[in-house]
UniProtKB/Swiss-Prot annotation:
It catalyses: Hydrolysis of Pro-|-Xaa >> Ala-|-Xaa in oligopeptides. This is Prolyl oligopeptidase A. InterPro entries: AB_hydrolase_fold, Pept_S9_AS, Pept_S9A_N, Peptidase_S9_cat, Peptidase_S9A, Prolyl_oligopep/macrocyclase. Its EC number is 3.4.21.26. Housekeeping prolyl oligopeptidase (POP) that behaves like a conventional POP by cleaving peptide bonds on the C-terminal side of prolyl residues within peptides that are up to approximately 30 amino acids long.
Length: 761
């Protein structure tokens, strides 16, 4: 990293800014107390507290929990109000154009070999609404050295809607290679409908249209949610999960908010009606549990997973498909029948199962079990590395394994043999994230490498080639609108309030100085054992370039960066650690001159939206320059009552439990808005079809913010996206407009200066 000169003097800044093409912009003029009004009711909820007994909690915006004409009018007024503010940004259109240019480059996945002996891959020319599936014309591995587009289009979801709101949510090819089963979600809903088509009938331009899809078979499976598709070896049908149909007709998908109950695993036979599907598993005594069924690659076994919540703990049952007729009377080998750990079946060699688990191994290990000799129990195959998190395992060549570890949040890729011995490390010099795709019987695997300044490199390892040629770069993404090499990332460590060391990535354009003047985007999550790994974002890099800003990504507790121990340190009564870690990150950035005081815009989505709102409520006035909370969980007393919310109790606690209520109530964003403090410019983003974190969280919090602090000298806004959900399946145009709005909001509310080019002062 370069050393930089001391900051230029204050009296020279304006002149230098003009000389280098920058334009100083003051924050957009804001007139308080002009918000659309929201009716306040006298609704009160009663809870039990371990320390206070009965507690009555007013909920004046209870009516915003349900869709109604009144709710729709209020949200429309809010959206119009917010739109007026955002459109007053003189840089808004220029920022959108810059984002569009930086996003317009070919994006692709690693190829995968299907049983029809063709190669398939995901591909987007740049600004297509939805990514398409392409395939080779024969069994030859595609050569992209001359062109980004080779082969033919196999499945183009853009043909399913005129506005890009129909998206592919799941898929699987039959073992015979003749059928393609796929789920389609509308407007970002978690609900999908599964269809089936012949692989000889592509959904491609020229063959089909939005109104005409003749290549699809008559099979139509509705009410599918949180499901995968897994074919049996005979290719006669597949397993999937669905919910009862009551109240979830297509027109209501994404609008209904009732809790998800009574999930069921079914088996569907091709060419039959959904009403004839075979019920395989349900649990009427535990209606909130969810399931997954996956057939092993050799087709011998089906694995049944049971999850009662979002904790990394599940049941694992195995059935031999050769000895069982598919149905409710299948004989299951309940190899893991208590919720004590996570058990993930990697693959099998005959009756020998390979399982990734965190049983007595917070960073995960691999064990084996001979299902024909279960009395022998689990045998350790690859032990836990206490300093590296085992994130992914793939079997290839029948006798080799590709393992991805994360050491201090940086990916490491290794090859092991079938005795559990490490053979080699690949891509040793790469710093970033890694994912692997493979087939158990093939002699190769593909690894996709990404990072803060790496848009995507697909590499191939082929054991049949000479040793020095086994590892090679197969395909590299090339960005047109900006140069990723102009940016650099570093990792630093800082102390949280309790002395815990927290890692944080800092990204900048190479011409941006660490002299205490740079604005910053600080992104975080901190929950559900989910790691925030190095990622590539052309819009964020463009923002960094145009505004001389930095990106900071602290890997706070509650996530999965260091295994279950790290996750456990940020859940339930320890949630305060998550917020403390995030606030401490901002203070570290300012103290060490990575960022300017009062110019750090914090951002997060879903659980990260909760993080942002909670930190705004808790931090000292002036800590943050702006706050952008996306689809956040903001009413922590009500979250279990809606859709899949009950599953989050494992992280947040149960508000109906008197002990849990006491700590939940102290940090629920809706119930802890400070009355005597100036809050930073704040924008909440939600979507009308979000049936994961229902929009009532953002609706109620926005109404309460605006009522409690009507004279706040900074805006407190709500942005509502129409025909969109929690984020999955969102079209490229919607993502682009959202990025322009949220980062434009950060720039206009903090008064940032647009830089037409960077000056290396």
């Amino acid at each position: 990293m370069h050393r930089f000169l001391q900051p230029v003097r204050e009296r020279l800044r304006s002149a230098l800014a003009r000389y280098f093409g920058s334009r100083i912009m003051s924050s957009t003029q804001w007139t308080p107390n002009m918000y659309p009004s929201a009716r306040r009711s006298d609704h009160i909820d009663t809870y039990r507290s371990e320390t206070r007994g009965e507690v009555k909690v007013p909920d004046p915006y209870h009516w915003l929990e349900e869709y109604s004409e009144e709710t729709d009018k209020w949200t429309s007024d809010q959206e119009e109000f917010t739109r007026t503010y955002l459109d007053s940004n003189p840089d808004r259109k220029k920022l959108e154009d810059a984002f569009r240019k930086s996003m317009d480059y070919p994006k692709f996945s690693a190829p995968f070999l299907n049983d029809d002996k063709r190669w398939y891959w995901f591909y987007n020319t740049g600004l297509q609404a939805q990514t398409v599936i392409c395939r080779s014309k024969d069994e030859t591995l595609p050569d992209f050295s001359e062109s980004d587009y080779v082969g033919e289009t196999f499945f183009d979801p853009n043909l399913l809607s005129s506005d890009g709101t129909a998206s592919l949510s799941m898929y699987d090819f039959s073992h015979c290679g003749k059928y393609f089963a796929y789920g389609i979600s509308l407007s970002g809903s978690d609900f999908s409908t599964i269809y089936v088509r012949s692989t000889s009938s592509p959904l491609a331009p020229g063959n089909n249209s939005i109104r005409n899809d003749d290549g699809r078979l008559p099979d139509e499976l509705r009410y599918v949610k949180f499901s995968s598709i897994s074919w049996t070896k005979d290719s006669k049908g597949f397993f999937y999960q669905r919910y009862p149909g009551t109240g979830t007709v297509n027109g209501q998908n994404g609008i209904q908010t009732q809790g998800d109950r009574d999930a069921m695993i079914y088996y569907h036979r091709i060419g039959t009606s959904q009403s004839d599907d075979i019920l395989v598993h349900e649990d009427q005594e535990h209606p909130d549990w969810v399931f997954g069924a996956e057939v092993t690659e050799d087709g011998k076994y089906v694995a049944l997973y049971t999850m009662k919540d979002t904790s990394r703990k599940n049941l694992l049952w195995i059935a031999d498909l050769g000895q069982n007729e598919v149905g409710r009377n299948m004989k299951w080998n309940k190899i893991c029948n208590v919720f004590d750990s996570e058990y993930d079946l990697i693959g099998n060699d005959g009756s020998l199962l390979y399982i990734r688990t965190n049983k007595a191994a917070p960073q995960y290990k691999i064990v084996t079990l001979d299902i024909e000799k279960p009395e022998l129990g689990f045998k350790e195959f690859i032990p836990e590395d206490p300093k590296a998190y085992l994130s992914q395992v793939k079997i290839f060549n029948k006798d080799r394994l590709a393992l991805v570890y994360k050491r201090n949040v940086i990916g490491e890729l290794y090859v092991y043999n079938n005795t559990g011995s490490r053979l080699m490390r690949l891509a040793r010099d790469f710093v970033g994230s890694m994912t692997v795709t493979a087939r158990e019987t093939e002699p190769w695997f593909f690894a996709t490498l990404t990072g803060f300044n790496t848009p995507g490199i697909v590499c191939r390892y082929n054991i049949q080639r000479p040793e020095e040629q086994r590892w090679s770069v197969y395909r590299t993404a090339k960005v047109k609108g900006l140069n990723p090499n102009d940016f650099e990332a570093r990792q630093v460590w800082y102390d949280s309030y309790d002395g815990t060391k927290i890692p944080m990535f800092i990204v900048r354009h190479k011409n941006t100085q660490f002299n205490g003047t740079a604005p910053a985007i600080q992104y975080g999550y901190g929950g559900f054992n989910i790691s925030i790994n190095p990622f590539f974002s052309p819009t964020i890099l463009t923002f960094l370039q145009k505004y001389g800003a930095i990106l900071a990504v602290p890997n706070i507790r509650g996530g999965g960066e260091f295994g279950e121990t790290w996750h456990d340190a940020g859940i339930r009564e320890k949630r305060a650690n998550v917020y403390d870690d995030f606030i401490a990150a901002t203070q570290f950035l300012v103290k060490n001159k990575y960022a300017a005081g009062g110019k750090v815009a914090i951002n997060g989505g879903s659980n990260g939206g909760l993080l942002v709102a909670a930190c705004v409520n808790r931090a000292r006035e002036g800590t943050f320059g702006a706050a952008i909370a996306e689809v956040g969980v903001l009413d922590l007393l009500k979250f279990p009552k809606f859709t899949i919310g009950k599953a989050w109790i494992s992280d947040y606690g149960d508000p109906e439990d008197p002990r849990d209520f006491d700590y939940i109530y102290t940090h629920s964003p809706l119930h802890n808005i400070p009355k005597n403090m100036v809050l930073p410019p704040t924008m909440l983003l939600t979507a009308d079809h979000d049936d994961r974190v229902v929009p009532m969280h953002s609706f109620k919090y926005a109404a309460m913010l605006q009522y409690t602090l009507p004279h706040n000298r900074h805006p407190l806004l709500l942005r509502v996206d129409k025909k969109a959900g929690h984020g999955g399946g969102k079209s490229t145009e919607k993502r682009l407009q959202e990025a322009a709005d949220k980062w434009g909001f950060a720039a206009q509310s903090m008064g940032l200066a647009w830089k037409d080019r960077q000056a290396n002062l």
